[in-house]
Amino acid sequence: MKKMSSGEIRQMFLDFFKSKGHAVEPSASLIPVDDPTLLWINSGVATLKKYFDGSVVPDNPRITNAQKSIRTNDIENVGKTARHLTFFEMLGNFSVGDYFKKEVIPWAWELLTSPKWFGFDPKRLYVTVYPKDKVTKELWQKTGVPDDHIVEAEDNFWDIGEGPSGPDSEIFYDRGQQFNNVAEDDPENYPGGENSRYVEIWNIVFSELNHLPDGRFVEQPHKNIDTGMGLERLVAVIQGTPTIFETDLFMPIIKATEKMSAGKRYGVSAQDDVSFKIIADHARTVTFAIGDGALPSNEGRGYVLRRLIRRAVLNGKKLGIDHDFLYQLVPVVGEIMKSYYPQILANQQFIQKVIESEEARFRQTLDAGVTLLNQIIADLKQDGKKEIPGADAFKLFDTYGFPVEMTNEYAQDEGLQVDMAGFKKNMAAQRDRARKARGDRQSMGSQDKVLMSITTPSKFTGWTELDHKHASLQTIVVNDQLQDSVSEGTAQLIFDETPFYAEMGGQVADHGEIKAQDGTVLADVSDVQHAPNGQNLHTVTVKGKLETGQQYWLSVDPLRRKKVSLNHTATHLLDQALRDVLGEHTHQAGSLVEPDYLRFDFTNFGQVTPKQLRQVETIVNQKIWDALPITWKEMPIEEAKKLGAIAMFGDKYGSVVRIVKIGDYNTEFDGGTHPTNSNALGLFKITSESGIGAGIRRVEAVTSKEAYEYLTQQQDWLSETAENLKIDQVKNVPSKVTQLQADLKAEQKTVAGLQAKLAAQAAAGIFDHPEEVGGLKLIAKQVQVAGMNELRQLADKWKAKQASDILVLGTEVSGKANLLVAVNDTANQAGFKAGDLIKAIAPKVGGGGGGRPDMAQAGGKNPAGIPAALSEAKTVISQKA
């Protein structure tokens, strides 16, 4: 068997299948861009679904790839076993209705055993087959695998319910008894058994059957091949390491961690080794995930990242690392993987910044959290208890940022567990408190019992009309009670059909009127939300009698709808422009579309520069002026994916979705309203950009008339400034301001010089005649200086001159009092502290203060009290002495 690096092994696999006519598919992003059902890409085939389900026809039906993947269902086992990882690479070769068993089996054997390729010893290879799959067994025999190296196993059948299925065949490598964790005569000591001697290196799935809803299996007309070979395991076998962690994929990370630890070394302590392995795995995972655009947060994949980073930081603490360190491993990961993933080093600074920020955030509460957790565990052990109360686990989560899974893992290491039911109860109580704090307004997720009971359908007609003259009133709800009629007050109404848009996806609801057939206004619509069963629920202020079963004229405010629609389109253009300028790591994190402005939240670490904002703004305006047609249609979700429509993570989509397309520039899954052409927006102007949380930025902007008014207001302010500066043309304002700033700086320098002279003059006499009070020399005087800074300068001169034992100074600045007290070592030894003395005299000027034992200061609102404060200082000193 050849000795190769991990990079060479990966490349050899791809080169082999390229020689067999396969197209090399680049590794896709870890973040699924066309599959809302997945949190992460978790296998080599996950990115190829579009080919196997027939929604996209590949240019070449033979495909090979090395796909980065993340699986997080066994996080707690990472580091504690020889095989669990959260990030891994899956090597694979695939056939979409092209070749099948008689081709793939000989190829697999050739790649593994040929001296030209991996060069495995055939005697150390074993294969497993499904007992009923006689064809596969015969093909392995023809390939040269002896019968005693072919194992029949009932679990060699791939089936996930309805859909494609079929037998599979696994290939194992015999590492020898020296690598085993069970005895040679153990019943599990066979290829496919629970042992560490026989390592599975490849799985070949023969997708030849279709599992029907009635449970029957029928043969598929087009047979497919799906294979998976874990790179990390393969590298461990080829490099002859005890586990995957000793390979060149992990050891550089472990060595770098050793250098930052408190003298810890890998391979010395089993307990320390667990921490080294956890850090190495998690460093890889978070580096690649953030590189692909994921960011730490409290939900979804962001929560997974936060949990991994904090788990790594906690294990770093176990190794004696008390500073931010995980971000320093990013370039190590990048260097290891640069041959196939150069983008890690290219994006290194951004990835490091995200991790460092998250580390620093957690480290603020880490020590206190660990101390509390250790105390909880010690108390439980002393009382003979085995379960951490849910309330304590919640406190660790809510106050100290400890994911409950991490607390539970920490507890398990101590032979304890967390009361998860109690934790969930506390979480539910917190959510309930949050709901109450938000008030009683019923939201889209309202589960009110009365509304839940309403199942009458309601159709939205507002895509094509703003007036619907014959809407039948189906339901009236007043104070959570169903009624047949209403004549005043506030009510909630459901019609069989309505043009009113219900708030959704950040777009606010339509407003308007409900009228009688003669045009008499009977109610004003102030809000529309989705009822629990999907109907549009209109909140109205009633002006006339409304009755169920009657028909009414529903009229949407056309101007409000138009303005909201324009701003909604602007969010789509803004979203795309941000991706164009900042990169694909940027994605929408929230939005609000109002009639008069729009707000758009997006992921990005660091402030967006003025230059970048100008680029974004320019792109959006250019797309507006390009007069791009805006079209929308409903279509099957798979067809929408083929169009490359952007799906918002966290949103759930049915089998039929609505797609909004702005020319060829932007295509998104969307349920909002839009104009028919981008030129309807007229103008787009960003009014602010700010940070609202870790990794989340917010842009506010205006369009159309509001954008014009905003620019007009800016122009008015600029003109007013020019007038005040006595400038004829506003274009000269910047140069005039620059000149004034230079003049001001020069004047400030002059003033500072004069103040220094005044301070020197003031100091000239105040130190000359100290008085003796209580056996100590005291200088207590009111001086005329510019402020507290000058008082401190006087105190420095007093200290240098050793003019007295205690100094008390007061000055009036802008109608307020400043006091300063300084004491030397002699006064300190006599029991006088500056902080105590300042607290005693500050009330005389109507203020308070504090400071160090040798110097303290105070401020107050009553400068007239300065003489009394100085006198009080003498009294306090004389009494204490």
Swiss-Prot record:
Primary subcellular site in the record, as a coarse category:
cytoplasm
- Short name of one Pfam family: tRNA-synt_2c
Q: Which InterPro entries match?
A: aa-tRNA-synth_II (IPR006195), aa-tRNA-synth_II/BPL/LPL (IPR045864), Ala-tRNA-lgiase_IIc (IPR002318), Ala-tRNA-ligase_IIc_anticod-bd (IPR018162), Ala-tRNA-synth_IIc_core (IPR018165), Ala-tRNA-synth_IIc_N (IPR018164), Ala-tRNA_ligase (IPR050058), Ala_tRNA_ligase_euk/bac (IPR023033)
Q: Which UniProt keywords apply?
A: Aminoacyl-tRNA synthetase, ATP-binding, Cytoplasm, Ligase, Nucleotide-binding, Protein biosynthesis, RNA-binding, tRNA-binding
Key word Oxidoreductase present in the record? Answer: no
Enzyme class, broadest EC rank: ligase
Q: Can you say where in the cell this protein is located?
A: Cytoplasm
The Swiss-Prot or TrEMBL record annotates one GO molecular function as: transferase activity
Described by its record, this protein's role is as follows: Catalyzes the attachment of alanine to tRNA(Ala) in a two-step reaction: alanine is first activated by ATP to form Ala-AMP and then transferred to the acceptor end of tRNA(Ala). Also edits incorrectly charged Ser-tRNA(Ala) and Gly-tRNA(Ala) via its editing domain.
Please give the family membership noted in the entry: Belongs to the class-II aminoacyl-tRNA synthetase family.
Classification via NCBIfam families: alaS
Quote the HAMAP family the UniProt record gives.
Ala_tRNA_synth_B (MF_00036_B)
Q: What is this protein called?
A: Alanine--tRNA ligase
Q: What is the lineage of its organism?
A: Bacteria, Bacillati, Bacillota, Bacilli, Lactobacillales
